[in-house]
């Protein structure tokens, strides 16, 4: 054990990390627990696409805290780190780096192989940087054996999983309308789009379509005018009422428009802005059912020759029923383009309508006069065309939310394309039931998860990209039959090309392989790659190379992952193993700035974890992030709260330094024999630290990390530093071998060692540093090789409750002193406490006297002047009009007598039964008394002062100032000094006491090394001008 000085947490971090690295501590801990019970954790993989942000840091700190806790419980923790390395996040970054604007550029400018190489290089480079950032936070994970989806064995597991899905008839290829990114030129799954809706300003267009066999018009509303050239149907709700609106124009002409009756006024109000309408009226109202089957003339028939061909097909350009039609806006008639919307697609399929989606992968039209034009660039031109044909009812703008690409942030299109799907709809009910068996933290996430899954459709797993796991599906060019390959060995066996290097099965190498179909035709691989969420969904078993289900005992990610990663891994496990892949799942919130804004470069409010740890050290950030609020709530990052956390840890360090330095001074060697001599306050802190340990273990098991850290903070600040250290400070000044001193040291030693064992998961650096200084030769070399234990025999609930009362009393005395401006250095002659706590006060009254600086404690009811106040609210409920008579009866009894009578229960006066709740007793307190309420009654403090009180207070004033001067002079604890005091005359007894407290000798003359002058003002307004000289005792 060595002397301890002040701490710099950042320097401490570095020192401890160097120690761990030199001693290979992480691996030693792993080896130590190798035969312990297994604890399986799956790391939700971050994308290797840049530096970590505060949310990523929070995520890894949560994981590291839980896993460190499990290690000190003796578990053999499977803790592989994981990385997301495929997909659009990486591709978009590489495209930006090489100024690539399209997939065509990839193939013509640098080539597929070079692009794949650059993606791999980018991912690996950022992996190394991000790993260093995680390690800087003190994170212990198995980074050496981290799972990487770009490795062949992991990719093969994706193939094996997909073959299992195929064998279970859960894999299908189908033409469906879904999300399409025109910038990335690929389809997206619905779970990738959740949370990616942004507010946009789009056209709001009302259009009229002329009915084929009459001069009447149906009206529709759309925010995507560009889809009108692809219109195939119009939907109505058969149950709604539709009005035939006679519209008269200023030029004397008239038309009939068909609009849902409830929306007529809204639509006509808009129509009047763009048309010279003189008046309108409803001529008749019909049910939507009567409109079904009516044919209309496509509004852009002349501009799109393809529509002229479609017009010859039965049911095309026809009004059909649709349950999705509502009256929440629009016209009650819905424009339907089966190539550009899920509802539209399903309606079209139901009525055998061709799926017409005339746009290419870049979102440009392939038919009509707008051929070659990007869809969003068509809007104004389509509107102008409708105006020229007198078919526009109204044109405006509307703000609404619209889905965007989750990586490049481009507005998405709804487009019908052929894709590969996992048929989740067949097993959705099983997924929901399995999800209910998971231990969700917090428990309400279960409802959110189940509700989210209930709305999912089949999973679109194919992506028209490059950097990903290639779909292991080969399709025959002759008969269209397809086969799913489940491993590289199977592919080698079936391959026509035997010389292709398959050590890496990314594109384009795997595309060179052809198979022979049973019909004799050539089979080529479908060019698509798997959804990157499929990659991470494989993690529970692919990360450990197992084809058997191994349920994770703990996973945690941010709240955006509830229907993303939590879902993707569950869905794949359900497909392959018919079960969920995790037992306990914790959701955490997002990190925001101090005002609650999302952090972003544009707002300039991003907080870098590296910058924070450089300023504060990793442990301060770790403790702050886990204690700022409940983990599942969004966290508003605050530097002032970081300062408070640092201050709290500094308080712990100072308490440790105080303890260690005195122990070193007295050559203290820990020995459990000293526990035989513990005092009440020692027994209390021993009980408290084990109670805290118990609470911490319970909280970490859940895990409720806020409960864990709040318990630690409260113990450090209130129990240990502000209470126990104060109680035993005087014992550290006793003779070297005094048993009271030794038992205090033994208690301090035990408490600090136990405390850092509890804190080690959240403050690993600080805990290790203290442990290294305090450990004895027979102890393990690292704190993380110790097991966290709870000594239940130390726990004494009665003692803790009694001490809590004593602390309340002391706090009340301090409040009373503040009220009376009566500083703690001046003794109080007497306090009066209620008799109901006599037993507790008789046992521990000495603590009240020491900590409150009180000379005498009196246990009795305070004898002030008692007055009675009737409780009119309660009396009114019972006695109503008799209340005045009851009040008179109450006032007829002396207050002291009434109070005594009511102690026994109800009391009858003038035929009225008086209950305790009918009255309130108040005590009038004399000027020399201050009363303060606490949970068991009131503390009454006598604030009268006499000469003895003043002298004792002045003694403390002088001691404090000499101690302050010693600190200024940087003197060792035990270093003797000579003191000369002027301005106050003390008796020899008082001078002897001061000398003992400050390690000094009072002398008449000295060669001053340091002089200070003060003016001391006592509570009774006396003033003393003093001068103190100190000479080092050479």
Curated annotation (Swiss-Prot):
<dbReference type="GO" id="GO:0004822">
    <property type="term" value="F:isoleucine-tRNA ligase activity"/>
</dbReference>
<dbReference type="GO" id="GO:0005737">
    <property type="term" value="C:cytoplasm"/>
</dbReference>
<comment type="subunit">
    <text>Monomer.</text>
</comment>
<comment type="function">
    <text>Catalyzes the attachment of isoleucine to tRNA(Ile). As IleRS can inadvertently accommodate and process structurally similar amino acids such as valine, to avoid such errors it has two additional distinct tRNA(Ile)-dependent editing activities. One activity is designated as 'pretransfer' editing and involves the hydrolysis of activated Val-AMP. The other activity is designated 'posttransfer' editing and involves deacylation of mischarged Val-tRNA(Ile).</text>
</comment>
<keyword id="KW-0963">Cytoplasm</keyword>
<dbReference type="InterPro" id="IPR002301">
    <property type="entry name" value="Ile-tRNA-ligase"/>
</dbReference>
<dbReference type="InterPro" id="IPR009080">
    <property type="entry name" value="tRNAsynth_Ia_anticodon-bd"/>
</dbReference>
<protein>
    <recommendedName>
        <fullName>Isoleucine--tRNA ligase</fullName>
        <ecNumber>6.1.1.5</ecNumber>
    </recommendedName>
</protein>
<dbReference type="GO" id="GO:0002161">
    <property type="term" value="F:aminoacyl-tRNA deacylase activity"/>
</dbReference>
<dbReference type="GO" id="GO:0006428">
    <property type="term" value="P:isoleucyl-tRNA aminoacylation"/>
</dbReference>
<dbReference type="InterPro" id="IPR013155">
    <property type="entry name" value="M/V/L/I-tRNA-synth_anticd-bd"/>
</dbReference>
<keyword id="KW-0547">Nucleotide-binding</keyword>
<dbReference type="InterPro" id="IPR009008">
    <property type="entry name" value="Val/Leu/Ile-tRNA-synth_edit"/>
</dbReference>
<dbReference type="GO" id="GO:0008270">
    <property type="term" value="F:zinc ion binding"/>
</dbReference>
<keyword id="KW-0436">Ligase</keyword>
<dbReference type="Pfam" id="PF08264">
    <property type="entry name" value="Anticodon_1"/>
</dbReference>
<dbReference type="InterPro" id="IPR033709">
    <property type="entry name" value="Anticodon_Ile_ABEc"/>
</dbReference>
<keyword id="KW-0862">Zinc</keyword>
<keyword id="KW-0030">Aminoacyl-tRNA synthetase</keyword>
<dbReference type="Pfam" id="PF19302">
    <property type="entry name" value="DUF5915"/>
</dbReference>
<feature type="short sequence motif" description="'KMSKS' region">
    <location>
        <begin position="598"/>
        <end position="602"/>
    </location>
</feature>
<dbReference type="InterPro" id="IPR002300">
    <property type="entry name" value="aa-tRNA-synth_Ia"/>
</dbReference>
<dbReference type="Pfam" id="PF00133">
    <property type="entry name" value="tRNA-synt_1"/>
</dbReference>
<dbReference type="InterPro" id="IPR014729">
    <property type="entry name" value="Rossmann-like_a/b/a_fold"/>
</dbReference>
<feature type="binding site">
    <location>
        <position position="601"/>
    </location>
    <ligand>
        <name>ATP</name>
    </ligand>
</feature>
<dbReference type="InterPro" id="IPR001412">
    <property type="entry name" value="aa-tRNA-synth_I_CS"/>
</dbReference>
<comment type="similarity">
    <text>Belongs to the class-I aminoacyl-tRNA synthetase family. IleS type 2 subfamily.</text>
</comment>
<dbReference type="GO" id="GO:0000049">
    <property type="term" value="F:tRNA binding"/>
</dbReference>
<dbReference type="GO" id="GO:0005524">
    <property type="term" value="F:ATP binding"/>
</dbReference>
<keyword id="KW-0479">Metal-binding</keyword>
<keyword id="KW-0648">Protein biosynthesis</keyword>
<dbReference type="InterPro" id="IPR023586">
    <property type="entry name" value="Ile-tRNA-ligase_type2"/>
</dbReference>
<feature type="short sequence motif" description="'HIGH' region">
    <location>
        <begin position="46"/>
        <end position="56"/>
    </location>
</feature>
<keyword id="KW-0067">ATP-binding</keyword>
